């Protein structure tokens, strides 16, 4: 229902307009206060790159964070990552991730980023505290990438990158809750880069698509072509589950059942195992896999995806970030 409201297919969005105007007024006032320096943002001693979005829901932001971190690491840059840690609840904050940190403590996306990149990752509702925790333990960190936080104006940033779903884009264009917008589309004029996940990019936007890798068995780590798996049940607890199901079909998989779950939904063995019958194979997203690995069955697999950016702009962006991190 919410997708139909936000896309404008359902007329119910008009009933929510008063709340949207209030949301827009408050969020706009907050940003204006920082812009006019009525409130002061905290500036880190190292450059900060924000990877965020203008809309609620999944846009492919986390794969972009992983891509950025890996690309900078390949250039010899030491990168730290901070996040709000949505979906997790730590005993205390800030929380610096380790090999033993669970998604229940840190949230699924920070754990995924940590496992993928081996970069220092910290979570906290106050991102400045997360940055301080990283720099205290890892003084060699040269640049911070923040996963989400475009609207977290308490944190000063040097570069802003926005990720857009190229198919859904901005829906009906209205602020939450009548539409999907955290900020209106005009905000794009002030950011440093706009990355478009799928769809047809517009002038000045960087095209991106998610490239699936081999399926990985959660229990054994065995890899295989996902099309070799039979009697597949697909599960996705991400911001936009249909994207994952479409990726599977693109890979030649015709799932017998597709199970969309809420983003950041808590998972347990009983609930997940109930999704498959004898002889069926469960295929999930990598984000779900970090929550299920501890209690996985032998017939559970996940399909990792990597961000692939096209054109000349990604190289220019990386050169800019490398120069920033190097102090040039």
UniProtKB/Swiss-Prot annotation:
Pathway, per record: Glycolipid biosynthesis; lipid IV(A) biosynthesis; lipid IV(A) from (3R)-3-hydroxytetradecanoyl-[acyl-carrier-protein] and UDP-N-acetyl-alpha-D-glucosamine: step 6/6
Q: Pfam families of this UniProt entry?
A: LpxK
Q: Which family does it belong to?
A: Belongs to the LpxK family.
- Gene field: lpxK
Q: Does the keyword Lipid metabolism apply?
A: yes
- Known catalytic reactions: a lipid A disaccharide + ATP = a lipid IVA + ADP + H(+)
Q: Which NCBIfam families match?
A: lpxK
The free-text function statement in the UniProt record for this protein reads: Transfers the gamma-phosphate of ATP to the 4'-position of a tetraacyldisaccharide 1-phosphate intermediate (termed DS-1-P) to form tetraacyldisaccharide 1,4'-bis-phosphate (lipid IVA).
Q: Which residues bind ATP?
A: 55-62
| Enzyme Commission number(s) from the entry | 2.7.1.130
Q: Name one GO cellular component term.
A: plasma membrane
What is the official name of this protein in its record? Tetraacyldisaccharide 4'-kinase
Supply the InterPro entries for this chain. Answer: LpxK (IPR003758), P-loop_NTPase (IPR027417)
Q: Can you name one GO molecular function term for this protein?
A: ATP binding
GO BP, sorted A to Z: lipid A biosynthetic process; lipopolysaccharide core region biosynthetic process
Catalytic EC class? transferase
Q: Which organism is it from?
A: Escherichia coli (strain SMS-3-5 / SECEC)
Q: Which UniProt keywords apply?
A: ATP-binding, Kinase, Lipid A biosynthesis, Lipid biosynthesis, Lipid metabolism, Nucleotide-binding, Transferase
- Asked if Transferase is a keyword of the record, the answer is yes
């Amino acid at each position: 229902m919410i997708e139909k409201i936000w896309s404008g297919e359902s007329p119910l969005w008009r009933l929510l307009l008063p709340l949207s105007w209030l949301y827009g007024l408050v969020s706009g006032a907050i940003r204006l206060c920082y812009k006019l320096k009525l409130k002061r943002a905290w500036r880190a001693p190292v450059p900060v790159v924000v990877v965020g979005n203008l809309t609620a829901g999944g846009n492919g932001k986390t794969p972009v964070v992983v891509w950025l971190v890996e690309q900078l690491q390949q250039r010899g840059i030491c990168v730290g990552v901070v996040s709000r840690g949505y979906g997790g609840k730590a005993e205390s904050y800030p929380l610096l991730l380790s090999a033993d940190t669970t998604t229940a403590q840190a949230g699924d996306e920070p754990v995924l980023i940590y496992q993928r990149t081996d970069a220092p990752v910290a979570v906290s509702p106050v991102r400045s505290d997360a940055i301080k925790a990283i720099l205290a333990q890892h003084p060699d960190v040269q640049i911070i990438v923040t996963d989400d936080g475009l609207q977290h104006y308490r944190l000063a940033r040097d570069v802003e990158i926005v990720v857009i779903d190229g198919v859904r884009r901005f829906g009906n264009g209205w602020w939450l809750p009548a539409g999907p917008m955290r900020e209106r589309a005009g905000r794009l004029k002030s950011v440093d880069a706009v990355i478009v996940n799928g769809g047809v990019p517009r002038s000045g936007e960087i095209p991106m698509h998610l490239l699936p890798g081999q399926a990985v068995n959660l229990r054994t780590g065995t890899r295989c072509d996902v099309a070799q798996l039979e009697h597949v049940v697909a599960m996705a607890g991400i911001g936009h589950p249909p994207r994952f199901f479409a990726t599977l079909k693109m890979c030649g998989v015709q799932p017998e059942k597709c199970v969309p779950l809420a983003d950041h939904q808590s998972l347990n063995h009983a609930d997940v195992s109930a999704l498959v019958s004898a002889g069926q194979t469960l295929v999930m997203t990598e984000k779900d896999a970090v929550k299920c690995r501890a209690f996985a069955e032998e017939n559970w697999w996940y399909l990792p995806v990597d961000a692939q950016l096209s054109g000349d702009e990604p190289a220019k962006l990386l050169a800019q970030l490398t120069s920033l991190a190097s102090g040039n």
